[in-house]
Curated annotation (Swiss-Prot):
The lineage of its organism: Bacteria, Pseudomonadati, Pseudomonadota, Betaproteobacteria, Burkholderiales. NCBIfam families: MnmC_Cterm, PRK01747.1-4. This is tRNA 5-methylaminomethyl-2-thiouridine biosynthesis bifunctional protein MnmC. GO terms for biological process: methylation; tRNA wobble base modification. It comes from Burkholderia cenocepacia (strain HI2424). The gene is mnmC. InterPro entries: FAD-dep_OxRdtase (IPR006076), FAD/NAD-bd_sf (IPR036188), MnmC-like_methylTransf (IPR008471), SAM-dependent_MTases_sf (IPR029063), tRNA_MAMT_biosynth_bifunc_MnmC (IPR023032), tRNA_S-uridine_synth_MnmC_C (IPR017610).
Amino acid sequence: MPDRLVSATLALRDDGTLVSPEFGELHRGASGTLARAHRTFVAGNGLPARWQRRRTFTIVTTAFGAGAGFLAAWAAWRDDPARCERLHVVAVEPHPFSRDDLHRAVSHMVVDTTISADVDALLDAWPILVPGLHRLEFDEGRVVLTLAFGDTIDLLKKLVARADAFFLDGAAASGDGIRALAKLAGEHATFATHAKSDDVKHALGETGFTFREVDDRLVGDYAPRWRARRHEPPRALPVAARRAIVIGAGLAGCAVVERLAARGWDVTLIERHERIASEASGNPAGVFHPLMTRDDNVASRLTRGGFLHALARWRALERAGHAFSRSTHGMLHLAESADDFARMRDAFDAFGPPSDYATLLDADAARAHLNLPVAQGGLLFPHGGAVWPAGLCVAQYAAAGERVRLLASTCVARLERRDDTWHALDDTGATLADAPVVVLANAGDAARLAGLRHVTLQPVRGQLTLLPPGTTAPLPCPAIGDGYAVPLDDGTLLIGATFEPDDTDPAMRAAGHAENLDRVRHLLPGLIGALPDPATLRGRVAFRWVVGDRLPLIGPLADETQATANARALGGAQARDLPRMPGLYGAFGFGSRGLVWAALGAELIASQLEGEPWPLERELADAVDPARFLIRALRARRVGSAG
């Protein structure tokens, strides 16, 4: 059963103090002031001096509340001409406010009108209240707030970050919380807190923190006398120049290009076709929605995180003038049977999502929503829908501006590493491009280029069908189930798609159109009227590459040769123990979920390269790690000398 996220509500005491009735003094920061937050947390951590002239600086705050600590840090950063290039704030909050209550709390707290624009930006970006990590960007991406909604101690154990400073408050001011923080602390990390109990001091001392009392607070440094951590927090990849090669210009590759360019990387994008988005990313539309399961499993959490992260990135692209075609009328996932609807209901009841994330509709409500007969109800995702993937790719490419160079109609025969530089070579051995970093986003060819033996990708043929305007009933939003139907802007209805594993025939088939028609007629019986011979219908064939566990492959690629040589020692390895090929990353195997996973995968890779906080929890990053199949083989003693 998933842990439900319970939001905090707000009440005003007679003395003017804002409190949360359900949780007592949980949000003490809501009734404080920015000046108090600055004195305690910002100045208490030696800021702004400590972040000056650095590329990035990371603050972990253990109780977001109404955002006093974050707003104080943001204001101090903006006022400092020697500020770091990029400020990260990772904020844990077990009981976040709704947007309306946050507005009330911040309005009560903030008297400094100079930051009113910051408050408005925070409220505008405030995420849907569902568990997990939510990444928000401000000041053109130079200030990044990663909100972690859920149990404080549990999330602190799952975060991946190298913290430079801690704003210690709330439930984390305890032994378990401080021990979790110590695993995130970088060299010379500092902390500040109002908590001064003997238990807090004991936990600080035993985990390597020094401390001293200053006025009404405790401050100190991470300065352990010994190194007892098996794994150090992540560091930036050391490179002589911030240059990268991205191979593959579909959804995965263009998302990576945009995220790297936003951080100041120069990127060479290599595409074997004449233009970007020429394969599956060239379909007229793709459906976009999360997944809900009763146990909120890894796939459910990954799709939720990817779905919400993509929405945020797309809105940022649109605000920057890089718009693309996407529907904004929601999407209805119809159950395929009574048992399927019961599973949907169980998942909905267990998760208890807010209505702006998902709503359960019975058959009558679904029928009224679509104005069409349906056999079953389903889940309505108000922010789901359909996206023109090629338009999204073009928007991301345009956002990269002068930092990207496209080599179209260019095939990479092999990769070669010399000294600290990767060379992409053609079939004559000539260098097409070179850089310290390569990201493989070229679907089925990625494993060949990287020489991966423990990654198996399967091609799946998908044929979609286009029904001419006037041949179908109006459909107010995309609908999916066993098949899908998507209304396009010109009145065409896109339906599909076939799922044909290991079939690599690119030719259009009348049988594929007939299959799509049968599936959608069952899904929405009143949608399709009389049609001509299926052999005369238009459509498109594309190939999706899927992994055995149906999860993508995102992150640094393993050095399988070195791992094989050390197989016996790596028999109990975790992902962090494996040797990696320096500067070689992958973003492939997305199957039919490229729209959901591409933006989050790109942000993960960019964060890994830069040594920034990761946008998803360790468990989820491990679940998409390209080395996961090698790890399983090592544990099963099926590799090298362990065999």
